[in-house]
Amino acid sequence: GCRYMFGDCEKDEDCCKHLGCKRKMKYCAWDFTFT
């Protein structure tokens, strides 16, 4: 499944909807989208 906020990630696709991977810190964070 997808990674939630602050979950480990390698790329944006690893994260749940509305989350993007912060490559520098290697965690999922909100990508500023609502839809």
From Swiss-Prot:
Keywords: Disulfide bond, Ion channel impairing toxin, Knottin, Neurotoxin, Secreted, Toxin, Voltage-gated sodium channel impairing toxin
Additional free-text comment from the UniProt record: Negative results: shows no or weak effect on hNav1.8/SCN10A, rKv2.1/KCNB1 and hCav1.2/CACNA1C, hCav2.2/CACNA1B, alpha-7/SCN9A nAChR, alpha-3/SCN3A nAChR.
Cellular compartment(s): Secreted
Species of the source: Pamphobeteus nigricolor
Coiled coil: none
Protein name: Mu-theraphotoxin-Pn3b
InterPro entries named in the record: Huwentoxin-1
One of the record's GO molecular function terms: toxin activity
UniProt free text on domains: The presence of a 'disulfide through disulfide knot' structurally defines this protein as a knottin.
Described purpose of this protein according to its UniProt entry: Gating-modifier toxin that targets voltage-gated sodium channels with a preferential activity on Nav1.7/SCN9A. On Nav1.7/SCN9A, the toxin acts by shifting the voltage-dependence of activation to more depolarized potentials, whereas it does not cause significant effect on the voltage-dependence of activation on other sodium channels. Minor effects are observed on the voltage-dependence of steady-state fast inactivation for all sodium channels tested (Nav1.1/SCN1A-Nav1.8/SCN10A).
Chain segments annotated as transmembrane: none
Residue pairs linked by disulfide bridges in the UniProt entry: 2-16, 9-21, 15-28
Family stated for the protein in its record: Belongs to the neurotoxin 10 (Hwtx-1) family. 28 (Jztx-11) subfamily.
Keyword Zinc applies: no
Cross-referenced SUPFAM superfamilies: omega toxin-like
A cellular component annotation (GO) from this entry: extracellular region
Tissues where the protein occurs: Expressed by the venom gland.
Keyword check for Disulfide bond: yes
